[in-house]
């Protein structure tokens, strides 16, 4: 998921996306621990997508704070 796609979403949609990514990361960790994971690169991809979502959320929060001031 690209940063531009994330910037087009609302903060509520981003929070939902972050929740879904955290759940997926949790499941992937368990799959890795039990040796059932097929695509190990997906763990890295999910972790980076979550970081992108958090970054965009922080950018939107800062922009909203500056707009109020």
From Swiss-Prot:
Give the protein's recorded name.
Large ribosomal subunit protein uL29
Which family does the similarity line name? Belongs to the universal ribosomal protein uL29 family.
Keywords assigned by UniProt, alphabetized: Ribonucleoprotein, Ribosomal protein
Q: Which PANTHER family match?
A: 60S RIBOSOMAL PROTEIN L35/50S RIBOSOMAL PROTEIN L29, LARGE RIBOSOMAL SUBUNIT PROTEIN UL29C
Sorted alphabetically, the Gene Ontology cellular component annotations on this record are: cytosolic large ribosomal subunit
Organism classification:
Bacteria, Pseudomonadati, Pseudomonadota, Alphaproteobacteria, Rhodobacterales
Q: What's a Pfam family in this record?
A: Ribosomal_L29
Q: Which gene encodes it?
A: rpmC
Q: Which GO terms describe its biological process?
A: translation
The source's superkingdom equals: Bacteria
HAMAP family assigned: Ribosomal_uL29
Gene Ontology terms for molecular function: structural constituent of ribosome
NCBIfam families hit by this protein: L29
């Amino acid at each position: 998921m690209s940063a531009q796609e994330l910037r087009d979403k609302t903060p509520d949609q981003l929070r939902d996306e972050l929740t879904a990514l955290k759940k997926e990361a949790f499941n992937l960790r368990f799959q890795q621990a039990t040796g059932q994971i097929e695509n190990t690169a997906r763990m890295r991809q999910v972790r980076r997508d979550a970081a992108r979502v958090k970054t965009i959320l922080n950018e939107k929060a800062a922009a909203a704070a500056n707009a109020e001031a």
